[in-house]
Amino acid sequence: MTFRRTWQNKSTHLKITLGAFVLSALSTTSLADPIDKSAIQFIGPLAEDMQLKPYQTDHRDAIIANLLPSLQTSSDSIHLFGNDVDWQAFDKVSALTLGGLQALKFTASTDRFSQGTLTLKGIENAQLFIDGEKQTEKNQAYELALSQGDHQIVIITEQVANWNQVELDFTAKSELDTLQFSAKQQHGLSAKQLFDAPTINFVSMAPNGDYFITSKRHYEDATANQAQYVTELKDAKNNTLYRFESAQPSSITWSPDSKRLVYLLNGELKRLNLKTMQLSVIAKNLSGANGFQFYDSNSLIFSWSKSPEDNGKLTKHYQGLQDRWSYARTTSQVYLLDIATGLSKIVSQGPLSHSLEDFDAKRGSILMSRSAQAMQLSPEPATELVELNLATSALNVLGQFKTFNQAKYTNEGIYVTAGPDFNNGLGRNLPQSMLANNYDGQLYLLSRDGKKATALSKEFNPAIGQLNVLENGDALIKVTEQDTVQLYQYDLSKKRFNKVNAGFDVVEQFSYSKERNPSILLTGTTASTPQQLKQLSLGKSRAKILWDSKPIAYKDTAIASLEEFNFTNKDGVEIKGRVYLPHNVDKSKKYPALVYYYGGTSPVTRGFTGRYPFNLWAEHGYVVYVVQPTGATGFGQEFSAKHVNAWGEYTANDIIDGTKAFLNQYHFVDSKRVGNLGASYGGFMTMLLATKTDMFSASIAHAGISNITSYWGQGWWGYLYSNEASKNSYPWNNPTLYSQHSPVFHADKVTTPLLLLHGDSDTNVPVGESHNMYTALKLLGKDVELIEYKGADHQIFARDKRFDWWDTMLAYFDKNLKEQPQWWQYLYAEK
C-alpha cells in the first residue's frame, strides 16, 4: 500500500529511514511516506567473534566479494561457521550495535530509466552492490542509474554505531526519476541472467551409454568477458567421477570399449583410464590439431591444419576470391596417430585441404571432401567427395558437387546432406520455373562407388542440418522445422522420418550411445523455458531431466508469456509468428511494440535467449512480434526458393502485412509506437522497409546491407551468399536487382528515425554498408544515428559489449516509442 501526503519543500531531496518504502519524485508537491520496515530484510551478526573487520585487513574486497553470493540468494538463512543465521524483517532488530558483519537486502524497481543519489547515514563502513556489481562510493553516497525492471541492492555493513539512527537519503535527479523499494523475492528477467547463466555447451556420451561428459559455461562480474568453464565426467546415474576446472578440454573422444577417454588440453593429447582414473600423455606439440576420434582400439584419426608464415612482403598478391579470407592459405590434412608411441602419419594427399567426413576401419577406408574451387581458383564453389583406401593408398573420386554439406557411411552406401540441386537437381521439389535455395538442406543416399544417388527427403519440409549415423545404419539428424530445431531419425529400412520427441523448441547439443537401442543425451530450450539437459531412449516418448538451469539462474523470475500469431499473406501462404507479452500485461492499457525478423534464408528460432533477447524486451514493457517472412528454410522448398533473386521482394510485404494483422489482433498495442529491427539480412530489411513504409516510429539495423553490389564485392562471403540469394544475377546482367533493391538508392524516401549499429571489424557485412546509409541520410537531413562497436565483427559476443549493445537498442526505442530520452542521453550525452 502506498500513502501520499503534501510535501511543501520544493527540493526533490528525499530522506528515508531504512525500511520498505516507496520513493517518488513525480512532482515536488507529493511524497510517498515510508512504509513498514518489515519489508526490508536484515541479517546479522555474521561471524560475531570476528577480531578485525574486513576494512581493517589487507583483503577487504576479497572477503566481502566471497560473502556476497550467499547473501544474494532467496534462502531464508545462510550457514556460516557451523551456524545458521536467519534473515529477518528489519523492524525486528532492536540492538544498537552488533558484532561481526551485517547485511541489508531489498529490491529497487522502476518502470523507466531512473537516476539519483543514494546516501547512507549512520553506517561508517559498508559496501553496496546492485545486481551483484560493486558500486563506487563518494562521501557515503552512491550514484544510481537503473534501467527499467527490478534491481537487487545488497549493503554489507562493517561498522554501525546505532542501528536506530541508520538512514538512507535518496535524491532523484529529476521529477521523472521514480524508484520503488521493497523486499519482494520475485523479480523480472534481467540481461545478466540471460548472459551469465550457466549453460551446457558440450555433451558427449560413451559408446556403451555408461558414461557421459558435459561442459558448462557461465560468466560473472569478477571475470568480466572471460567465460568460466567446468567439464565433468559422469556415470549413468549422473554422479560426477572427474572434473576439469582450470581449462576446458577439447576433441573429446571415447575408446570403442568405453574404457578410455582421450582429449586435447593445452596442446597435449591425454588419455584417462576410466577404471583407475590414471592420466597419461599420448602426444605433445599438437597446435592446430582437432577432431580426434578412435579409428580403432590402437589409433586415432584427426585433422591437422597449418597456416603459412608471413612472407614479409609489403604487398599481397590475390590469386583468387578466397584470398580475402584471413585463413585462405591455411591447409588441413587428415592424419592417423598411434596411441602407444604417439607417432602420426599423414593419410591425405596433395596440396589441397582435406576435410574428414567419416571412416570405416573394417574396410580400411576414409571418406574425405576437398574444395574443387581451391583446385581451380574458380569463383564457383564445388566440392569433391573422395575415398581413400588405406591398404593401397588409392584415392577414388566419388563425385564433384556444386552443393555439399556432409557425408557419412551407412550400411547401404553413403548418406550425403546437400541442397536440392545436388547431383543435377536430384533433390528438387519445385516448379520448373523456380530456382532452388541450396541452404535448404536435403538428405541423399549415394552408392559406395558414387555412381548412383537417391533423394530421401524431397517430401520432407524441414531443412536438414547435422548428420549422424546410428549403429543400425539409420540416420540421426538435426533439422530446422519451421521456427524450431528438432531431432529426427531416418529409418533406412522403412524409408521414413521419425521425430525424436524431446520436449524442446530448440535442440542444441546432442550425443548418443552406440547400443542397439541407443540412448540420447541432449540440451535445449523452449521459447519460454531456459536450458535443460535431458536423456531419452530412442523410440521411447519420455525424456528424463538430468539438469535444469531454471532453479539455478531463474528462480523467482517472471518470464514473458507467449502466444502464437500466424496470418495468411496475399499469396495465400500462412506466415508463422509469435508474440511475447510482458508478464504483468494489462490489456486495458496501450503498449509500445517491437517487430523483429531476419528475412534471410533461415528462420528466427524459438530459443529462450540469444543475441536478440525477446523475453528481455517484453520485460521492458514492449509487446514483441517475431515474424517468419517468406524465404526461410524449414517450411518446404517452395517457401525457401522465394528467397532467390528476391532481395526483400516478398519479405517486405510479409513484414508490413504481418505487422498490420498483428496490430489489428492486439488492440492493446499502440499503432503509433511500433519499432522494428533486424540484423545482417534483417538489417538490410530494416533499411529497405524504411524506404517503403512509414508505419514504424523507430527502426534499428544491425550490420545491415545498404548496397547489394558493395556487399557482394567486399564482404568476405558476399559473392558466395549471392550464389543463392542472387543466383545467376550479377551487376552487369541484372543491374535493376543490385541497385533498385539496395536501400541507399532510395534513401530520400526514408522518414522513420533510424539507428545503425555495426562492429567496426565486420568482415561479413563490412561497416561501410552502414556508412553508406548514414552518409546519405545525413546529407538528406534525416533522423539517423550510427554506433560502431570497436573491435567487434559481425556479431557482438563480448560480455561488456553485449550489455552495452542491448542497452543501446532499448534506450533508442525508449526515446522514440516511450518519449523517454533519458537513458539514451545517459549513454550518449553530447560532449
Indicate residue ranges for each PLM-predicted region.
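Accessory carbohydrate-binding/adhesion or oligomerization-edge regions at the termini
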Residues: 32-94, 154-191, 196, 821
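Short loop/turn segments that connect beta-strands within beta-propeller blades
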Residues: 234-237, 273-277, 338-342, 389-393, ...
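A flexible loop/linker signature enriched in serine peptidases of the S9 family
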Residues: 197, 216-230, 244-249, 263-270, ...
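Aromatic-lined ligand-binding clefts that engage carbohydrates, nucleic acids, or primary amines
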Residues: 110, 114-127, 153
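Cap/lid segment of the alpha/beta-hydrolase catalytic domain
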Residues: 549-672, 679, 713-718
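Blade-terminus and WD-like Trp-Asp/Gly-His loop motifs, strongest in beta-propeller folds
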Residues: 203-211, 251-260, 264, 291-299, ...
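Active-site-proximal cap/loop segments of hydrolase catalytic domains
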Residues: 629-831
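Non-catalytic accessory segments flanking enzyme active sites
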Residues: 193, 200-204, 211-216, 303-304, ...
